[in-house]
Amino acid sequence: MNGKSSVLDSAPEYVDKKKYFWILSTFWPATPMIGIWLANETGWGIFYGLVLAVWYGVLPLLDAMFGEDFNNPPEEVVEKLEKERYYRVLTYLTVPMHYAALIVSAWWVGTQSMSWFEIVALALSLGIVNGLALNTGHELGHKKEAFDRWMAKIVLAVVGYGHFFIEHNKGHHRDVATPMDPATSRMGENIYKFSTREIPGAFRRAWGLEEQRLSRRGQSVWSFDNEILQPMVITVVLYTLLLAFFGPKMLVFLPIQMAFGWWQLTSANYIEHYGLLREKMADGRYEHQKPHHSWNSNHIVSNLVLFHLQRHSDHHAHPTRSYQSLRDFPGLPALPTGYPGAFLMAMIPQWFRSVMDPKVVNWANGDLSKIQIEDSMRAEYIKKFTHNVGADDKRGATAVAS
């Protein structure tokens, strides 16, 4: 027996108390179908908006009730935990769940008599869960195995965001918490303005990265080896079939659910690194990203439906680490609630800023020069925050203004 095996065999017995609760992440995409069933059984069309109520209302309340979990798996059991097949299988099973939600919802809209209000409510509900197909693709796309990476492309095709596979792994993880990253929001930048640079910026960066990769291999960017075109083709075929089978209502239903799915990623990107900035070194490069360059959340319930996405700090420190092994660290910048509640706050900019701006300033120890700030808000922030900091911090704030 080699030394490595001995270490694994002698690892302390660890019990993941959440092990069988992770199945909530797998079944979360089925929620729109539950809404359809309830609407059909009761005759109340309001149930088509079930996911909206659960996501923006019920989950934040449950997060507040059940609180946070700061427990970590011991480092010596992480390798063994990573190899446990159960956790990976749950992510695989989530992929067909996303397809089922899309196809069943499209079938229902195409074959039933529904008001436009009901169609939009169901489209938005589907958009939330299929927006979180991006989360499933995120978990699978960081893996090294070819099967996992193809599963990521397949699930990203559900919501027509196949370029995320390239953009996130090769772009966002490289540039996060710097001015070069369109997926890092600035303090004072509202989510609506952020979306206008994040959505097109993400696609441009992904396309450029893939063009460079293929060029190095002597291939055209229009080659089918283009990993952006692969899921894009799946999306086109899938949506064309849905249109052919379920009729012209799909011309409204599919774009709405897709747009709201994209909005979920925009919301996540907006809150995950809001205002945070890596320090620029003497050679002009930015410091290596660290766990404190991401906003973290240990809220139990929302983490259980998001494959631990909210332990975002450790994810950026160890991108290939699976969800069940992600850790919390002392002193991390922390969101006041889980992602559903934070997404809701973000849609009301004054509310979000009133909660998060002081947190960002505290994160920077009052030095505004260490924060990414929206240009139009600089003067306001200098006036608002410099009276609470010392002379050294005021010099930092002055440096920001210059």
Swiss-Prot record:
Location in or out of the cell: Cell inner membrane
GO MF term list: alkane 1-monooxygenase activity; metal ion binding
Biological pathway: Hydrocarbon metabolism; alkane degradation
Enzyme Commission number(s) of this protein: 1.14.15.3
A single GO BP: alkane catabolic process
Entry keyword annotation includes Cell inner membrane: yes
Cofactor note: Binds 2 Fe(3+) ions per subunit.
Keywords: Cell inner membrane, Cell membrane, Iron, Membrane, Metal-binding, Monooxygenase, Oxidoreductase, Transmembrane, Transmembrane helix
Sites where the protein binds Fe cation 1: H138, H142, H168, H172
Record-listed Fe cation 2 binding positions: H173, H312, H315, H316
Cofactor needs: Fe(3+)
Record-linked Pfam families: FA_desaturase
InterPro entries according to UniProt: AlkB/XylM (IPR033885), FA_desaturase_dom (IPR005804)
Protein name, entry field: Alkane 1-monooxygenase
Species, as recorded: Pseudomonas putida (Arthrobacter siderocapsulatus)
Phylogenetic classification of the source organism: Bacteria, Pseudomonadati, Pseudomonadota, Gammaproteobacteria, Pseudomonadales
